[in-house]
Design a protein with these regions (language model features):
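Iron-sulfur (Fe-S) cluster-binding segments and ferredoxin-like electron-carrier domains
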Residues: 72-77, 118-123, 181-191, 566-576
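Radical SAM/AdoMet-radical enzyme domain recognition
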Residues: 198-216, 225-344
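Local cysteine-cluster metal-coordination motifs and their immediate loop/turn environment
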Residues: 63-69, 112-113, 171-182, 564
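N-terminal [4Fe-4S]-dependent radical SAM core
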Residues: 35-165
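A short acidic, helix-capping loop that chelates divalent metal ions and anchors anionic groups
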Residues: 185-187, 278-284, 350-353
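Conserved alpha-helical substructure of the radical SAM core
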Residues: 118, 122, 132-257, 261
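C-terminal target-recognition/interaction regions appended to catalytic cores
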Residues: 494-653, 676-678
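Radical SAM enzyme [4Fe-4S]-AdoMet core and its adjacent flexible, acidic
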Residues: 3-6, 10, 14, 20-33, ...
Length: 706
C-alpha cells in the first residue's frame, strides 16, 4: 500500500477523533436504561455496575491446604466420609496471602496441621498489575442455576462461561505426563452413556444467562467414545454454534474419513495437544512419531473443513523453549492456524504428589510465557500487548447490546478472573506473512474504555455500531499496521467477528457447508489469537477464581468449575468413582483392550503427507535436558522410581549399620565369608529350620502406577 493511502487513513483518524467528541457529548444526555434480554432474567450490566473481586496486593483470599485435601478426598473415596461434606463444610480450606517479595508475586499460606506452603504467581509485578487493572468486571450473576450449581464453596456464581467441557470417557490411547485425569491409571472406566450426554447438553441451556458457549468434548481421548460423532451433531441441533474436541490427534491422523464425518456432524475446532516442533520436543509424551502425527492430523482436519487450535502444556525444563518455535510455526502457516492456546502446567492428576524440588523447577506462569515470547520471538511487550482474557467481555457486552432484547442467545463472554488467562492478537497477511501485534497499531485500552461508554449509553443498534466504528478509527495508527492492512479491513474484521451488520461472511451454524467454510477462510487477514490459560492446582488455589470460572465441566452431579473439578477438592475423582461404568477387568472382558501408544511406540497412518511449512532447524532441535543436567526428576514416574531406589539404598545402609552394631557393641562374630547361616536369621521361637529355595527366581519390584 502506498504512503499516500496511509496518510489518507491518518486524516480519517483525525476526523474520527473530532466526530467522537460530538458523539460522546450527545451520549451523555439521558443515557437509556439497560434492557433485559430474552436469554437472561436480569438486565444487561452497565460498566460501572460490574462487580470485581479483591485485586492488588497484599491481599487475603481463600485457598486450600495441599496436604489436607488429598487426605479428605481419600476418606470420601474409601467410603469413610459422605461426599455431601463438600457441600456443607469448608473442607481443607485455609487463608492465603498474595504478596510481593524479591521482585515476584507469591501466594503464601499456612496450615495448622501441615505447615507452610508458597508458590510463585508472577515473576513480573508490573505485568501482574497491568492484568488486574485491565479487568472490566464480572458478568451477570448466574441464575436459574440451582439444579446444576450446587457445590458448596466450589460453586460457580457469575456468568455462563465460554467453554462447556464434557468428558466422554476416561479411556485414552496415550499415557501422558502430565495428565489432569490420570487416564488409564485409576482402575476403572468412566464413560458417559448417550442419555447422559444428551441430558448434560439439555441441562446446560437452562442456566441463565443463556450465552453461546463452545461445547468441548474431552476425555481421556474423546474420539474413543462410540458417541463422539452423535454428541457433536446433537450439540449443533440444540443451538451451539461452536463445537470442539480436545484431542491428541491420533485418530484424526489415522483416518481422513473420521475427519470428514466429524466435519459433517458439525465439529468446528479441534484443540490439538501440541507440545513443540519436532519429535524430540514431544518425546516426553512417549510416542515415537508424535510430531508427525500432529502434522497429519492438522492436514486431514483442515482438508475436511475443521479448524485447528494447537494447545501446549508448558513445563519449565521440559518444553519452555518451544513457545517461540510454536508461534513461528503459526506465523509460517497462517492459512491453517488462527489460534494458539498455551497452558502453563498445573500440578494435578498424576502430579498432585509432586516434590517441592520438582515443583519449583517446573513451575511456569503466565508472566514466564509473556516474557519467553518476547525473548524467543521478539513479539509482544508484556504490559502493552497482553490483556486478561476477560478484557474481551466489553466487546461481548457491545454485541449483546446491538443484537437486542429478542436474541435467543447471549454472546460468548470470557469473564474469568484476571489471574486465569491472558491473550494477545497478531494480524497476519496470509499472502506475504507480514505480521504485527494488533495493539501496536490499535490502542486497545482506549478502545475498550470508549466502547464501555457506548455500551453505557445504550443508544440502540446503529448508533452503537457507529460508536464502535469511531472508537476503532480514532485509536488506530495506520503507520504501525501491516503494509497492506487498511482501516476497512479492521472494520470488516470486527463485523465478521460479532455479526454486527448481518453481512454474509459464511455461516458458522450447524447447517454450514464447505462453501461457507471456504468463504470465511478467503479473508486475506488472519487474526491470530495467542492465549495463555493457567489452571490452578492445590499450591496456588484461589476460590475467587473458581467463582467466575468460564470453563465449567458438565457432569452427572451438575456443572463444576474446571479447577474445582480437576484440582481443588478434586470432584473428578469423586464423581467418576460414584458413576463408574465398570472396573478395568470387567471392561476388558466385555470390550477388549483399546490400543495405547506409549513407551516410544509409533502410530501407523494410512495417509502420509502435508503442505505445512516447517523450520527444519526447529524440527531437528534436541529435547530439553535442563532437568537432567540439574539431576531433577522430569515427571511423577521418575519421582516414584527415585523414591523406591532411595528406600532400597536406605534399607541396605540400615542393615549394614545393624550388622556393625552387633559386631562392635554386642560382640557378635561376623558370618564367615559374608554368608549368613540359617540359624542366625531364623525366628528365636522356632527351632525348626525353614526350608530354603535352592533355585530362587528374580523378581522385579513394581512401581506404583505402572
Amino acid at each position: 500500500m502506498s504512503k499516500a493511502i496511509k496518510y489518507a487513513e491518518k486524516a480519517a483518524v483525525y476526523a474520527a477523533k473530532g466526530a467522537w467528541v460530538v458523539y460522546e457529548r450527545l451520549n451523555r444526555i439521558s443515557p437509556n436504561p439497560s434492557f433485559t434480554p430474552k436469554w437472561s432474567e436480569k438486565p444487561l450490566l452497565k460498566s460501572y455496575q460490574k462487580e470485581k473481586p479483591p485485586l492488588g496486593w497484599p491481599r487475603t483470599t481463600d485457598s486450600l491446604c495441599p496436604k489436607c485435601v488429598p487426605e479428605i478426598r481419600k476418606q470420601i473415596l474409601d467410603g469413610k466420609l459422605p461426599h455431601e461434606v463438600l457441600l456443607n463444610e469448608k473442607v481443607g480450606e485455609i487463608k492465603a496471602q498474595i504478596i510481593e517479595r524479591d521482585g515476584k508475586i507469591l501466594m503464601v499460606k499456612d496450615c495448622p496441621k501441615h505447615g507452610h506452603f508458597e508458590d510463585v504467581m508472577s515473576i513480573d509485578p508490573a505485568f501482574f498489575k497491568h492484568l488486574e487493572e485491565s479487568f472490566p468486571g464480572r458478568d451477570i450473576r448466574a441464575h436459574n442455576d440451582e439444579k446444576l450449581h450446587k457445590h458448596g464453596t466450589s460453586t460457580v456464581t457469575h456468568g455462563r462461561g465460554s467453554v462447556l467441557t464434557i468428558d466422554l470417557t476416561n479411556r485414552c490411547n496415550m499415557m501422558c505426563d502430565p495428565c489432569f485425569m490420570d487416564a488409564n491409571q485409576v482402575g476403572f472406566v468412566h464413560e458417559l452413556t448417550w442419555d447422559e450426554i444428551k441430558t448434560m447438553l439439555d441441562n446446560a441451556i437452562t442456566i441463565k444467562p443463556k450465552r453461546q458457549m463452545s461445547v468441548q468434548f474431552s476425555g481421556g481421548e474423546p474420539t474413543l467414545s462410540p458417541y463422539f460423532l452423535d454428541a457433536v451433531a446433537y450439540s449443533r441441533k440444540v443451538g451451539y454454534n461452536s463445537v470442539q474436541a480436545a484431542s491428541n490427534g491420533i485418530e484424526f491422523a489415522k483416518s481422513k474419513e473420521l475427519c470428514r464425518a466429524a466435519a459433517e456432524a458439525g465439529l468446528r475446532y479441534v484443540y490439538l495437544q501440541f507440545d513443540g516442533i519436532g519429535n524430540a520436543a514431544n518425546s516426553h509424551r512417549k510416542v515415537g512419531n508424535l510430531f508427525d502425527v500432529k502434522l497429519q492430523a492438522i492436514n486431514n482436519l483442515h482438508e475436511a473443513g475443521v479448524d485447528i487450535v494447537p494447545v501446549t502444556t508448558i513445563i519449565n525444563g521440559i518444553n519452555n523453549e518451544q513457545v517461540g518455535h510454536i508461534i513461528q510455526f503459526a506465523l509460517d502457516n497462517p492459512k491453517k492456524i488462527s489460534f494458539l492456546s498455551f497452558q502453563p502446567v498445573s500440578f494435578t492428576g498424576r502430579d498432585e504428589d509432586i516434590t517441592d524440588e520438582r515443583r519449583f523447577a517446573q513451575r511456569y506462569t503466565l508472566s514466564h510465557m509473556a516474557h519467553d515470547i518476547k525473548t524467543q520471538c521478539g513479539i509482544g511487550e508484556p504490559a502493552r500487548d497482553w490483556f486478561p482474557i476477560s478484557f474481551m467481555s466489553t466487546f461481548s457486552d457491545w454485541a449483546d447490546l446491538i443484537h437486542g432484547p429478542a436474541a435467543e442467545w447471549g454472546q460468548l463472554s470470557c469473564g474469568c478472573h484476571p489471574n486465569c488467562g491472558i491473550g494477545m492478537a497478531l494480524m497476519i497477511d496470509k499472502e506475504t506473512k507480514e505480521s504485527a501485534p494488533v495493539t501496536a497499531f490499535l490502542n486497545m485500552d482506549k478502545v475498550a474504555k470508549d466502547l464501555a461508554k457506548v455500551n453505557d449509553a445504550a443508544r440502540g443498534k446503529w448508533l452503537s455500531v457507529i460508536g464502535f466504528g469511531l472508537a476503532l478509527m480514532r485509536n488506530y495508527d495506520p503507520f504501525q499496521a501491516p503494509t497492506h492492512f487498511k482501516i476497512t479491513d479492521m472494520l470488516r474484521k470486527m463485523d465478521k467477528t460479532f455479526n454486527a451488520t448481518g453481512k454474509d461472511y459464511g455461516s458458522v451454524k450447524g447447517d454450514r457447508t464447505m462453501e461457507d467454510i471456504k468463504k470465511r477462510r478467503s479473508d486475506r487477514w488472519n487474526f491470530l489469537f495467542i492465549a495463555g490459560m493457567w489452571f490452578q492446582d492445590l499450591f496456588n488455589y484461589d476460590f475467587r477464581r473458581t467463582e467466575q470460572c468460564i470453563i465449567p465441566y458438565a457432569t452427572q452431579e451438575g456443572e463444576i468449575s474446571f479447577c474445582a473439578y480437576n484440582t481443588g477438592i478434586g470432584w473428578r475423582n469423586i464423581i467418576e468413582k460414584m458413576h463408574m461404568t465398570a472396573t478395568l477387568t470387567k471392561w476388558y472382558e466385555e470390550h477388549g483392550r483399546h490400543e495405547i501408544f506409549a513407551g516410544g511406540k509409533k502410530v501407523g497412518m494410512s495417509h502420509v503427507g502435508h503442505e505445512l511449512v516447517l523450520n527444519m532447524e526447529h524440527v531437528n532441535s534436541e529435547a530439553n535436558h535442563t532437568l537432567d543436567n540439574l539431576g531433577i526428576a522430569k515427571n511423577a514416574r521418575e519421582e516414584r522410581i527415585r523414591a523406591r531406589d532411595t528406600k532400597v539404598k536406605s534399607d541396605a545402609e540400615n542393615a549394614k549399620m545393624a550388622q556393625l552394631y552387633r559386631e562392635h557393641v554386642l560382640g557378635e562374630k561376623p558370618p564367615a565369608d559374608g554368608i549368613v547361616s540359617v540359624n542366625m536369621i531364623r525366628p528365636a521361637t522356632n527351632n525348626a529350620a525353614s526350608p530354603i529355595n535352592r533355585n530362587p527366581q528374580p523378581a522385579e519390584e513394581p512401581v506404583a502406577g505402572d
